A protein has these predicted regions:
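Pre-Walker A adenine-sensing motif
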Residues: 1-7
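A conserved segment at the C-terminal end of the G1
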Residues: 22-37
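Pre-Walker A (Motif I) flank of P-loop NTPase domains
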Residues: 10-13, 135
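Hydrophobic anchor at the beta1->P-loop junction of P-loop NTPases
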Residues: 16
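ATP-dependent NMP and nucleoside kinases share a basic, alpha-helical "lid"
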Residues: 140-148
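PAPS-dependent sulfation machinery
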Residues: 43-141
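Short, aromatic/basic-rich helix-turn unit that serves as a nucleic-acid recognition element
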Residues: 19
Length: 148
């Protein structure tokens, strides 16, 4: 059996990779200044999947499908205003992003459409926004490329 995810919400993922303390966070904060680049988030599952794939515990098609599926969940949740980090001392926190109001507005959205995605009344609007804006998701990893 081959695992395939034909539909995909997230079309652009940017990963800053390198050894620990090599300046990935600084680079990521610079990259957020570019158009459509979302605030920095750490998606730890990318490292877990990469490690499992490297040690041949999951197949190529399963690894790719899991990454696509999980990143689609992340883009939908972030564009819906979920799981926003408000800790002021955290480098992935909302206050360390140049435009925190974008994320606050997403949380306070009042528009509703017909439920079509797990009963979420904003689903159609969120999916349309993702397809129109094509956000670039930004994350970092620790030596991911060496385990790919």
């Amino acid at each position: 059996m081959k695992f395939i995810r034909n539909k995909q919400l997230l079309s652009r993922l940017l990963i800053a990779d390198g050894i620990g303390r090599s300046g990935k966070t600084l680079l990521c904060h610079i990259l957020t200044g570019f158009e459509n680049v979302e605030k920095l988030e750490y998606y730890y599952f990318l490292e877990h999947l990469s490690l499992a794939h490297y040690h041949k515990k999951i197949s190529d098609d399963m690894a790719v499908t899991l990454i696509k599926t999980q990143m689609d969940v992340q883009v939908f949740d972030q564009m819906n205003g979920r799981y926003i980090n408000t800790r002021p001392d955290d480098y992935t926190g909302l206050n360390n992003y140049h435009s925190p109001n974008i994320y606050i507005e997403r949380q306070n959205r009042e528009e509703h459409s017909e439920p079509n995605y797990v009963g979420n009344p904003n689903a159609t609007g969120i999916i349309g926004k993702i397809e129109m804006e094509k956000p670039i998701f930004l994350t970092f990893a620790h030596d991911l490329i060496s385990r790919s």
